[in-house]
UniProtKB/Swiss-Prot annotation:
The lineage of its organism: Bacteria, Pseudomonadati, Pseudomonadota, Alphaproteobacteria, Sphingomonadales. One of its GO terms (molecular function) is structural constituent of ribosome. Coiled coil: none annotated. Keywords: Ribonucleoprotein, Ribosomal protein. This is Large ribosomal subunit protein bL28. InterPro entries: Ribosomal_bL28 (IPR026569), Ribosomal_bL28/bL31-like_sf (IPR034704), Ribosomal_bL28_bact-type (IPR001383), Ribosomal_bL28_sf (IPR037147). GO terms for biological process: translation. Belongs to the bacterial ribosomal protein bL28 family. The keyword Ribosomal protein applies. One of its GO terms (cellular component) is cytosolic large ribosomal subunit. It comes from Rhizorhabdus wittichii (strain DSM 6014 / CCUG 31198 / JCM 15750 / NBRC 105917 / EY 4224 / RW1).
Amino acid sequence: MSRICELTGKGRQVGHNVSHANNKTKRTFLPNLQNVTLISDSLGKGVKLRVSTHGLRSVEHVGGLDNWLLKTSDDLLSLRARRLKRDIAKKQQAVAA
């Protein structure tokens, strides 16, 4: 399972541990990923995603999963999230028509 947020695209970063003597050793910084079930208002069901805590706060700030997906560009989203975005857009167009 990859260590990448499905909504924001945040992945691991590489840096150094720096000792008191300024010795540097390589290390990785992993995103704080959580397995969560987010509710889609348009689809009326829950969707299981692997999301970073930063992404979770962003989704809540925008007003829910549907708003987040429709406002976010496709290049940041995972394949599952892009499919979900397409389904939500279709459902909203059907309701509007």
